[in-house]
Amino acid sequence: MDTHLKRGILDVCVLRAIQNEDSYGYKIIKDMKPYLEMSESTLYTILKRLELSKMLIVYSIEHNGRLRKYYRITKLGLNRIEEFKKEEAMTKCKKAS
């Protein structure tokens, strides 16, 4: 699979995982596990890329005496999910014709 394509799909998977509620790294991996196996290093690389692309924001909250990083999707991140859905629909239409 093309590296850029794979990266794009993984980015959207992570965005979808935090689409409905803010989350933190371990929970994202746990929530995605039934659908997709992902290492922590891969996830944190994706989260950093999405943060730099302004598709999510990061904030910290204290939990059991330690700071935990939470991730929240932005409007750009929501737009990326919608773009991906449209791209998928176009691909399915092309295959059907």
Model-found features: residue ranges?
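N-terminal helix-turn-helix DNA-binding core of bacterial DNA-binding proteins
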Residues: 2-42
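Short alpha-helical
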Residues: 50-51, 79
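Accessory beta->alpha helical hairpin/"wing" motif in late/C-terminal subdomains of nucleic-acid enzymes
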Residues: 73-78
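Beta-hairpin "wing" of winged helix-turn-helix
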Residues: 53-67, 72
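Amphipathic alpha-helical dimerization/coiled-coil segments
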Residues: 79-97
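Short, hydrophobic-biased segments on the C-terminal half of alpha helices
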Residues: 44-49
